[in-house]
A protein has these predicted regions:
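Iron-sulfur (Fe-S) cluster-binding modules
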Residues: 1-172
């Protein structure tokens, strides 16, 4: 048999960050986005755990954060019943948020249909704890520092919040 030279594995999905890992838990998308929003507003990275008040298994969670003098009001909903209550409250004008995260599965993807089924909340909490542990140990904890994301902006989108990025990445 022919011998092949040793080589590095290719990385078809690019590099990941701790911020990407926590997407699997309710509040993780919000926390990752707030980390990068803070950077975009201030030019500095926040403490990576500065926004942990959006974490948890509560069905509907609210928080406010000061980003360089601007208050950002956010909500995180977990489970479709809580999502319905949140959406109805927004439609009625009872609440206002600048950013909302919705996770269909209670607790997030860590409790979704692709996971082994377990009725007790202890398993969901343990899974959540594992994701945040992986985030803490990752050298890259901020989405905006992901080399693959940076390359996309440099080569295609020009810069974060550019007109091109807005047209392609944002929904109406």
């Amino acid at each position: 048999p022919e011998e092949l030279d040793e080589d590095e594995f290719d990385n078809p999905l690019g590099e990941g960050t701790g911020a990407g890992v926590i997407f699997g838990a309710t509040g993780g998308v919000m926390e990752a986005a707030l980390r990068s929003a803070y950077y975009l507003v201030t030019g500095n990275n926040p403490d990576a755990d500065a926004f942990q008040s959006v974490r948890g298994l509560e069905g509907w969670k609210e928080a406010s954060f000061d980003l360089n003098g601007t208050t950002i009001n956010v909500a995180v909903a977990s489970g479709l019943g809580n999502t319905r209550r949140l959406v109805n409250a927004i439609k009625k004008g009872e609440v206002h948020y600048d950013f909302v995260e919705i996770m269909s599965c209670p607790g997030g993807c860590i409790n979704g249909g692709g996971q082994p089924y377990k009725e007790d909340a202890v398993m969901v909490e343990e899974r959540r704890h594992v994701l945040y542990g992986l985030d803490k140990r990752d050298n890259l904890r901020f989405s905006h520092e992901n080399p693959s994301v940076k390359q996309c902006y440099e080569e295609y989108f020009e810069k974060p919040l550019s007109h091109r990025a807005h047209e392609i990445l944002h929904v109406k």
